[in-house]
UniProtKB/Swiss-Prot annotation:
Attaches a formyl group to the free amino group of methionyl-tRNA(fMet). The formyl group appears to play a dual role in the initiator identity of N-formylmethionyl-tRNA by promoting its recognition by IF2 and preventing the misappropriation of this tRNA by the elongation apparatus. PANTHER family: METHIONYL-TRNA FORMYLTRANSFERASE, METHIONYL-TRNA FORMYLTRANSFERASE, MITOCHONDRIAL. InterPro entries: Fmt, Formyl_trans_C, Formyl_trans_C_sf, Formyl_transf_N, Formyl_transf_N_sf, Formyl_transferase-like_C_sf, GART_AS, Met-tRNA-FMT_C. One of its GO terms (molecular function) is methionyl-tRNA formyltransferase activity. Belongs to the Fmt family. The gene is fmt. Pfam families: Formyl_trans_C, Formyl_trans_N. (6S)-5,6,7,8-tetrahydrofolate binds at residues 108-111. The keyword Transferase applies. Keywords: Protein biosynthesis, Transferase. Its EC number is 2.1.2.9. The lineage of its organism: Bacteria, Pseudomonadati, Pseudomonadota, Gammaproteobacteria, Lysobacterales. This is Methionyl-tRNA formyltransferase.
Amino acid sequence: MRIIFAGTPDFAVPSLRAAAQRHEVVAVYTQPDRPAGRGRGLTPSPVKLEAIARGIPVFQPQTLRSPEALATLRALDADLMVVVAYGLILPKAVLAAPTHGCWNVHASLLPRWRGAAPIQRAIEAGDTETGVCLMQMEAGLDTGPVLLSQRIEIGEQDTGGQLHDRLAALGAQVLSDGLGLLRAGIRPVAQPQPADGVTYAHKLDKAQARLDWAQPAQELARRVRAFNPWPVAEAILAGERVRLHGAVALELAHQQPPGTLLAASKQGIDIACGEGALRVRVLQREGGKAITAADYLNARRDLPALR
């Protein structure tokens, strides 16, 4: 089976490997190289690096809407296009080009968390489970019928990065199952998404990572987990801005204003919130690396009252 694969970040790499294992991936589409790192040099996407390692031709158009881009894609004569976190909108003509259309691996249980950041939004919202859907793509944003799906639990301490890796592996397995069925001549039954329960996972940005101590500690702890490893939660602690890599909520009654440091030990730094307190365990000062609360306290000798 001739497959076009379209994807860009790390999340898509296991799915590319799954597609290439038993099928002919005739081309990989990925985002153009972007400036990255301290030198801001052009950096290829993880999917591009994987494709090059496998000897698969790589295409990096700025858009798929041009007649030239469509002609190039059609000339590949693909049976199926698999899309995993590609980052470009596919026009209707592209969706209709392959014999079996376009499949998408999406990291949520649709219709919950359509959109760009389903993994982080699930943690942020306090969801206890999530999963992966293999979807037949249509013109709407993640609105297509679901072909296959798998569920997993979200652990109480799962970070965005940890859940990302588990779902990337699960997505590859679900895709492999779907491709196996199609190769055997069995087209997965397309189940329309229900009209109820639709939510949207809006794109992450650094501004959303700034914590407000007036919010409940439970909400803040979930955001710390969700935004690890990016964009990483940040807040004002003891008069300086820090990034929070690890924290837990405490059901602690207090009468202190939000943001007040309540206690500190090698177990963590307890900060008053609108409800309860947040115990910060791992944090990062500006220009530094992530350190434990104990190491932070050793560096902040100006806080004797907290020891």
